[in-house]
Amino acid sequence: MESFTADTNSTDLHSRPLFKPQDIASMVILSLTCLLGLPGNGLVLWVAGVKMKRTVNTVWFLHLTLADFLCCLSLPFSVAHLILRGHWPYGLFLCKLIPSVIILNMFASVFLLTAISLDRCLMVHKPIWCQNHRSVRTAFAVCGCVWVVTFVMCIPVFVYRDLLVVDDYSVCGYNFDSSRAYDYWDYMYNSHLPEINPPDNSTGHVDDRTAPSSSVPARDLWTATTALQSQTFHTSPEDPFSQDSASQQPHYGGKPPTVLIATIPGGFPVEDHKSNTLNTGAFLSAHTEPSLTASSSPLYAHDFPDDYFDQLMYGNHAWTPQVAITISRLVVGFLVPFFIMITCYSLIVFRMRKTNLTKSRNKTLRVAVAVVTVFFVCWIPYHIVGILLVITDQESALREVVLPWDHMSIALASANSCFNPFLYALLGKDFRKKARQSVKGILEAAFSEELTHSTSCTQDKAPSKRNHMSTDV
């Protein structure tokens, strides 16, 4: 086996394969989202937050716009990360912060949309109660609770994200306790393993989702269909190698490096070997004995027999946080809110049909339904890909089809951040009047407090000035 020398460590990023179509599409989507979303959401924040009269609806959509604006602020880092093909030059703090912002946008948006749906449902079915209890202060309190829950849901991303540094190459990924799970393992291998043919794919987008394991046979390491696999590093308290080798070893969060025993591609940390060799301080099986010296790479992929990865057993140590994060995002951030919203809007439609008021011109209801629809269209691919990567077999044909679209689904989810301002403009008033309408007028029409009247409202409402004025809160 040819030894690894310093010359092989000088692989230039520009010498790697050209971007795949999925990478180019992701960069285009993210760039357009940033270019359109920042001014669009910024304008809505300024007008709705400063120029417009404060109402319950403006509070809802103001906080929703704030979540979108924060997400758009993080997108330039994601685009640069994609261009750099996995290299993360921004340090440990932003490695934790940027992926957390993307997840923050998801949870804040879905929770606020759920609150808006419940609010609209109550206005249709309990109009008198809403006139007496629905207020701007209550809306602010609900939004405050939404942000608290949202930050709690982002804690796992902030805690488990870590920075792996090998020489001058940094990778931002997930770190589950004593094992290191990192995205973009193919480029880390490609940078240090010159004898292996370079992969035909490229990576880069910040993956805010934990990636499942990839126990790929050695012959398939460089033909994987995606680079959004994780890289798992397992360390041992005992150092079977010389201290000189530490200079080549990866280290985490800028801390001094620990000696790397083995490098195995896969999203789930490798805790044990079926032959129990880890208990004796050795990671590799008896028939695999690659050496690691100061002038050698961590491990050559072709040193692993084809059946070596089949001998690995993944511990529950990382399975628990990884699957828990994926499932919690699906259930709390998608399924439960989706069920609540479908129920609310179904009840609204049922009441409107029952009272023969299907042509009621409730502008805010139309805006809310449109925003909810766009949100779920953008985020459905993200959750589908995440679940499929968890449940599919490592060598299944379905997995090979899904993997190339992993970071594309993240780009599409991020694109949701730029759509809402345009929905407000298109649905607020008749489109033919938009050109002559000021931004304030458009948003006032979109966020109007016009109630969807029901039979009970018509029969029970009091013709008092107080009740009349309370509809504009």
Swiss-Prot record:
The modification Sulfotyrosine is found at residues 174, 184, 308. Residues 233-252 are annotated as: Disordered. Glycans are attached at residues 9, 201. Residues 1-23, 81-96, 161-329, 390-406 are extracellular. The keyword Ribonucleoprotein does not apply. The chain crosses the membrane at residues 24-46, 58-80, 97-118, 140-160, 330-349, 367-389, 407-427. Interacts with VGF-derived peptide TLQP-21. Receptor for the chemotactic and inflammatory peptide anaphylatoxin C3a. This receptor stimulates chemotaxis, granule enzyme release and superoxide anion production. This is C3a anaphylatoxin chemotactic receptor.
